[in-house]
C-alpha cells in the first residue's frame, strides 16, 4: 500500500492512498462470499446463487462494503503510523472500485495544531480593584423586605403606583372588535412586573378604585398571536381594588427571620456584605482570567480546527439551554434558535478553543499536572457545592473515567493559568478605568 501525506495548512492534512489490486480483489471476493451466504433470489437456495446474479443484484452494496472496509483498515493504520492527531472524521474522496485494479482514495482531516507557545511570562494585564459598595447591601435588604411584604388594602382615594397590586376587569378590542383572549374579570396585576403589553401598566399608574378608562397600546411585532402582532388595540379597564405592599421594619426581629445566627440586624448586614465581597472577588478574578488568556492569545496567534470550534459552540449552547431551563426560560423565549445562537457565539467559542490549546501547551512545557492531593481537595469542593456525600462523589469520579479526565484537564488548565498569573505584571485599577 502506498501512502503520501500533504499539508493543506497547519491544521489540515490530506492522506493519499493506493491499495494494491490483489488486496482489492481479495476484499471483493470476501464480500461476495459473505453476501452469497445470505442472498435470497427466487429460484435459488441460499448459498447457491450464481456469482453473476450476486454481482447484478448486490454489486452496489458490495462496493460500499468493500470501500468501507478498505478505508477503515488503511486510514486508521496510516494515522497511527504517521503520528497524526485527528480532530473529527475525515472527508473521503475515492475512485470507483474495480476488481483487479488498484483502489485510490484520499482522506482530508483536521488535526490538532502543534502549538509552540511563547512569551507567556511577564504578560501585562489589569485587574479591577475590589471596592466595597454599601448600596449593594442596602439594595439586597430592600429585596428581602419586598419578599416578606404583606399586601394590605390601599387607603381610600389612593392612586395606583408602581409596585401596587391592582385588581381590575378588562376587555380588549381592535378597530372596535373584541378579540379572543383579550378580556378577563378580577384580574390582579403588580404594576411594574412587565406581565402586560409594553405601555399598559404605565397607563394604570394614577388610577383609583372605581376608575373606568381606556388604555391604548400597540401589540409588539413578533407577538405570539400573529393576528395581533404589530396592531394597535384599546383596552377598557375598570379598577375594582388596589392593594399596597406593607414592608416589614428593618430591625433585629427582621434579621432573626433569616436564621438563628442573625441575632441583630448588624449581623445580617455583615453577612450580606461578606457574600457580596466574595461574589465580587469571584467576578473580578474571572474577568482577570479572561484578560490574561486574551493577552496570551495576542502573543500566540494560532489556527484552530473548525471541528473543535463546532464542539465548543455546541457545549456552550447546551450549557445556555440548561441555565435558561433552570429559570423556566428557553432559547425561543429569548428570540433565538440553535443556529442563530451558534452564529452569534462562534467567534467566542473560537477564542475559548485557542485559549485551551495554549494553556495546554504551557502545562506541557512546564510539566504542570494536578496532584492526587489537589484532586481530593477538588472533590471535597464539588461535594460541598452539590451537597453530596464526599464518598459518593469520589466513587463517581473513580468509576467514570471520562468525568475524571475532564476534571483533571480543567484542573490542569487552572494550574497553568495560575502559573502564568504568578509571573504576570498585574496592575490594579478602579472599575471605571477598565475598558
UniProtKB/Swiss-Prot annotation:
Its EC number is 5.2.1.8. The keyword Cytoplasm applies. Pfam families: FKBP_C, Trigger_C, Trigger_N. Keywords: Cell cycle, Cell division, Chaperone, Cytoplasm, Isomerase, Rotamase. It is found in: Cytoplasm. One of its GO terms (molecular function) is ribosome binding. It comes from the Bacteria. One of its GO terms (biological process) is cell division. The keyword Nucleus does not apply. Gene3D superfamilies: 3.10.50.40, Trigger factor ribosome-binding domain, Trigger factor, C-terminal domain. Disulfide bonds: none annotated. It catalyses: [protein]-peptidylproline (omega=180) = [protein]-peptidylproline (omega=0). PANTHER family: TRIGGER FACTOR CHAPERONE AND PEPTIDYL-PROLYL CIS/TRANS ISOMERASE (PTHR30560), TRIGGER FACTOR-LIKE PROTEIN TIG, CHLOROPLASTIC (PTHR30560:SF3). Involved in protein export. Acts as a chaperone by maintaining the newly synthesized protein in an open conformation. Functions as a peptidyl-prolyl cis-trans isomerase. Belongs to the FKBP-type PPIase family. Tig subfamily. This is Trigger factor. It comes from Geobacter sp. (strain M21). The lineage of its organism: Bacteria, Pseudomonadati, Thermodesulfobacteriota, Desulfuromonadia, Geobacterales. The gene is tig.
